[in-house]
């Protein structure tokens, strides 16, 4: 028997979530319960807050706020994980809630735990950086796509191959964004 198989006896190697559950365990985001994971069990917002705090790097901060359940719950709430959700303590997380929390995570400010000499936990919030941008180099921008290659929304626009123009700024690209022209 492999180590992975023994980790959670209710998530065998042929289970559809096997790879994801084991990766989340290896990364320290989940721990299970005495060798069981209970993949079909719904979780509460308190349990979800533990996972999201660990992903964001807020584990020590949440523990400093009295840990489980309220420290994690309050940390997740403070950093926007529950933004736009009705999160009554003890309620079960729905699929839609999970999608919203993932969206909020990706758009949350980047945070780092810093230890001070007197062992207090201080959180450094980088408001100009998001989790998504920092870890995946994906950034949100707003503007109008004016040119794609030789196509333009303006008659007198200078267009060239392998470029796009957004709000007057040109970018080199090897992708086709023609379907987004004018948006």
Ranges and model annotations:
Residues 1-181:
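N-terminal propeptides
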């Amino acid at each position: 028997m492999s180590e992975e198989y023994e980790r959670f006896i209710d998530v065998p190697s042929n289970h559809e979530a096997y790879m994801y559950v084991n990766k989340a365990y290896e990364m320290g985001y989940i721990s299970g319960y005495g060798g069981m994971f209970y993949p079909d069990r719904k979780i509460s917002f308190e349990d979800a807050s533990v996972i999201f705090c660990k992903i964001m790097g807020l584990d020590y901060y949440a523990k400093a706020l009295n840990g489980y359940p309220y420290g994690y719950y309050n940390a997740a709430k403070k950093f926007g994980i529950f933004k736009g959700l009705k999160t009554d303590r003890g309620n079960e997380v729905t699929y839609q809630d999970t999608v919203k929390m993932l969206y909020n995570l990706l758009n949350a400010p980047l945070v780092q735990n810093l230890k001070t000499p007197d062992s207090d936990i201080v959180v450094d919030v980088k408001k100009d950086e998001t989790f998504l941008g920092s870890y995946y180099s994906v950034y949100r921008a707003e503007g109008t796509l004016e040119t794609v290659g030789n196509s333009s929304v303006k008659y007198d626009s200078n267009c060239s191959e392998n470029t796009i123009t957004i709000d007057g700024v040109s970018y080199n690209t090897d992708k086709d964004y023609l379907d987004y022209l004018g948006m």
